[in-house]
């Protein structure tokens, strides 16, 4: 079965399954997204591993209930996932920012689309990156994340 391509980004090829009204995401070869940390006051970017990519989906589902479902791997190690196609309009960035605040997030570097949530995990802050308006959709009066990056940043232990 051949599915039509509807988008291609820095991380995924996105195909549309007309029979199920779902998108199929295929990571680009050797690409599993990235994450950020602030080191010496500067944002530093790191490549994610396949395990971190899959963990992202778990956090995404726990926090927002809209994550893609992982399906498996291609022979070349690309991760396949399915996600319900959500029809809607692109929200304004201010609406996305307000959605994140209402979800319990606080801006780390808002102009860099970088947020965090404390009190979700006892050992880590959960960071949300790439929270740009084009990675969300406004449908039925709700903001829905459709392509975000989520990772844990360990909480420093006091007294070390």
Language model regions located:
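A short, polar/proline- and glycine-enriched secondary-structure boundary/capping micro-motif
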Residues: 33-39, 94, 154-159
